[in-house]
């Protein structure tokens, strides 16, 4: 046995004896693909270059990515080829019809009904879609009519959506957490003739909202048999009439108005066409045919499908051979993962943060906690060396290998044990957290997109060499460029045309030469990889004129094990400050380990000297990475988190900065920023 192997086994044995961890922890795939570099160095690559990215057995040649200086604008621009334009008659219904033709008797959706998991084949689903679509036609739904839809992620969501698409309707999305006022605004903005809600609680909320909705004719509740009633009415509509309606739908027809969750402003209705979703769905499989065409692969849907991200992924899965599992809810996610054992997952960073915090909390503050902390460092160091040098050194690889059977493997099992491609998007992911998951063998890849780009406009294909902090290359069919002020601008067939009934917002969102201005700040490296550096609207300009991007500072503070959220403030203020919230589940064991009252109220914890001292350490660490003018001078710990329930977080788990500032305005004006006498 070699010295390295002997050392590895000795470390494993000692750790197992000390901890007896077994499977106490809850998978990244290994980045060590034979004959393939972990990191594609760009040190000697000129800016003007055409790049055919390296690939492994897990992904195909895909499309050519070109990165160069646009001679017309002088801006660094990167583009990835996509499929040719779709036929004029292509619609979302075709994705389901094609799946049924290819794999009619094989599973398409699996979901939980009561205590049992139910599987629906592609043929069965298509028959369901046609039955509901006929019923909608009977209700008088004409091509181009809007249907407002309020429903949690479920089989009913996919069925209703597909049926509305089949008969040429326009789906106006409502989050299941939206208020009565938001329901009213969406129904009126979309001129919806029908409102479909999932359950009686939503119906009660809707009943209080629709008195001032002149376009609304019917409210249908799924829980009380609404879809069955629609199907029954549909028996009077012939297949020929339905097929005539389906054939009338064109790719350029409006199919949906997706209402943004509004983290910095009032929600806007983004107009989407059949082409937007179909182009996105049919472009990705060209990049990863082995992953998406293998019938053994599965995906678990759990994010809100009212969000464009989750909805686009559903269409991508339908257009592939992947079997789709639908989670029963975020609270049952861990148990649902054990059933679905997904090879693909789409997550927002908050989910990964919760997984990490749960594992850390389970390890505790004793010997297990020491080992878990060491495992985190080992994984992060491994990926840092991979990023810097192309390969990790022998000692770093050995340290990482020692933790795999006792920490990393259990983490992979919690996520189902088969994950090959986990895409994180919707918000920035802490680079340290990404490095941990990737170093631990959990295949987390960052992507980037917006509702206005039909979700993904940049992504890291499976097998992409690790580029620390990058959200990837341009998604097939997209071009990305960086404006002179650092703003990311996007062009492509899947970019939205306008905001519904909002010409002013539309005009402000596009450049004179037709590029969508995202409002996000970033850079593109010589290999065409995009890095997000901040958001223009979040950019803080202090009273002294200093520009501060809050994201990187917030990420560091949130690494404190019991901090849930950090919001950095200071726009037009004399200095930078932060509001910090506590993760109660992580806080209590920390208090106990410090010999403090683990049952103290959150109000007391927010004032506790030891708690404040721990947070101060992370604030200090964040300050080390910025100039003095950008550093956090003062922070306040709040006794409540920012949540959807208190209106401070969107359904896509983004903190709504203006609402937080408004809610705590008195606190900010009297305790954070006191006027000089």
Locate each region found by the language model.
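Structural core segment of the AMP-binding/adenylate-forming
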Residues: 2-61, 139, 166-232, 614
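Conserved AMP-binding A3 loop
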Residues: 119-123, 255-281
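ANL superfamily adenylate-forming
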Residues: 24-28, 201-251, 359-410
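Conserved pre-ATP/AMP-binding loop-to-beta segment of ANL
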Residues: 104-107, 221, 235-259, 266, ...
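Conserved AMP-binding/adenylate-forming core of the ANL superfamily
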Residues: 84, 108-162, 179-184, 231-235, ...
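Conserved ANL (AMP-binding/adenylate-forming) active-site segment centered on the GW(Y/F)…HTG consensus within
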Residues: 465-468, 495-519, 554, 594-606
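Conserved AMP-binding/adenylation subdomain of ANL enzymes
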Residues: 278-298, 305-408, 418
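Conserved ATP-binding/catalytic segment of the ANL
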Residues: 474-542, 559
